[in-house]
UniProtKB/Swiss-Prot annotation:
This is Large ribosomal subunit protein uL18. It comes from Yersinia enterocolitica serotype O:8 / biotype 1B (strain NCTC 13174 / 8081). Signal peptide: none annotated. GO terms for cellular component: cytosolic large ribosomal subunit. Pfam families: Ribosomal_L18p. One of its GO terms (molecular function) is structural constituent of ribosome. It comes from the Bacteria. Keywords: Ribonucleoprotein, Ribosomal protein, RNA-binding, rRNA-binding.
Length: 117
């Protein structure tokens, strides 16, 4: 099993458990250059809020889009947008990525901005 298959396996297991709970999910995906965050409805069919370093508004504030500062900016943006829509509680879905570095920076910034998880 290669590294990507192992990550997808971990993500699938976590998502199955979150689906049983029926929770709104804050999903994170990262690539070497960018990081993406989405708040997905409990049924999994609707994206309620999204933010990423690809967006012009966020990317203009950053020197480089693949570091912890960029992840924190995305976390803050997604939390603010979620709070505007009345979403305060979410479950954190790290998509099989290790809770470290950019993933942790995004989560911490979202918590500081007011999301609860």
């Amino acid at each position: 099993m290669d590294k990507k298959a192992a990550r997808i396996r971990r993500a699938t297991r976590a998502r199955r458990k979150l689906k049983e709970l029926g929770a709104t999910r804050l999903v994170v995906h990262r690539t070497p250059r960018h990081i993406y965050a989405q708040v997905i409805a409990p049924n999994g069919s609707e994206i309620l809020v999204a933010a990423s370093t690809v967006e012009k508004a966020i990317n203009e504030q950053l020197k480089y889009a693949g570091n912890k500062d960029a992840a924190a900016a995305v976390g803050k943006a997604v939390a603010e947008r979620a709070l505007e829509k009345g979403i305060t509680k979410v479950s954190f879905d790290r998509s099989g990525f290790q809770y470290h570095g950019r993933v942790q920076a995004l989560a911490d910034a979202a918590r500081e901005a007011g999301l609860q998880f």
